Amino acid sequence: MTSMYYNHDHLTASGKNMWSNFYVLVDTAVMLYEEEKQRRKIVSEEEEETQKRIFCLFPRKTRSSLVKRQQKLSGFLTSASSSLIDLNQFPSDSEIEDPLNHHQLLSSSCFIAADFETLQNPSSEPCSSLVLFDCKTAGSEKTETKDPPNPNFPCPLSLCLTENKNRKRRAVEQRKRTGGVKKAKVAPFSQTARETPEWLVNVMRDMKEAKDAKLIFEKTLFVTDVNPTQNRLSMPFNNLLRNDFLTSVESRIIDKDIKNDKKIGVGAILVDQRCKKWGVMLKRWEMKKESGKGSWNYNLICGWNDIVEANGLKEGDNISLWSFRSCGILCFAMEQRSPSLALCLC
């Protein structure tokens, strides 16, 4: 083994022993690297296998060519990028490098230092919004005719506080002139916390390792939600009561689907109030509007028509959707609050 590295016939016995030990260490390091690489590969395969387990319980339905054509015509398979964070709120590189903005950014930094006690006090308002506020109003101050002060001169504490108050006042006046901030649509249901329904508690007790029930969505069904040609329940992002029901692995799958025409989605189980289980798929689509803007929706598909038919759902019915976990698998529970439920249970 040692001859393959170096010809050391001229070395003494102790030198040969040292080199031999060195080669053993090198071979050991290579073996450890290969074992770590194999272990990471196994972990990655286990994560993928977790997502495939749902198809063992509920085989995926074969989609007809008619449904595929209708979905393509309706534009549901179009993809686009989205972000939960509005990057337009942050200054661009050109704005940061602009000398006219240097003093404004410096003033914002001084205000942050001056308001350090507010950060220490939990009852006070977070200052992150103040930082974003200063960045947004930095561009509007370019029109001021005042001589810019020397940026190398330290900013006095009183001046920083005064400048911040002026920025707030100008922002409030500007919002009044433009009609104020656009308010988000309010769901027709109460947003207050509700206890887990008794029937759902019983269902989770019967299922293996079921836990973490969350009320995530409430809706009055539209005609498109019960139309057999649509075969999906639309859940707009803006109407979700909470969006923390996906794991990191499931979120990565949903994010990768954004740029794919053929979306994979996340497998899940839906339980109705009759304790019947259905296999569904959760996917993310962009709904295009005539104005050119779009909105992102979650959609429950691949079995939704069967759920509508079995529960007698119709336009105008009110439903609530809960999420929970059973053996790590994503599960949904549909609570129906309408006369249709009484007819189905009879």
Swiss-Prot record:
Among PROSITE patterns, the record links this protein to: B3
- Residue ranges the UniProt entry marks as DNA-binding: 237-338
Pfam families associated with the record: At2g31720-like
Gene Ontology CC annotations of this record: nucleus
Q: Which GO terms describe its molecular function?
A: DNA binding
- Which organism is this entry from? Arabidopsis thaliana
Keywords, in A-Z order: DNA-binding, Nucleus, Transcription, Transcription regulation
Q: What is its main location?
A: nucleus
* Keyword Nucleotide-binding (UniProt): no
Which residue ranges traverse the bilayer? none
Task: Name which cysteines form disulfide bonds.
Answer: none
**What compartments host this protein?**
Nucleus
Region of interest (Disordered), residue spans? 168-187
Q: Which InterPro entries match?
A: At2g31720-like, B3_DNA-bd, DNA-bd_pseudobarrel_sf
Q: What is the official name of this protein in its record?
A: B3 domain-containing protein At3g25182
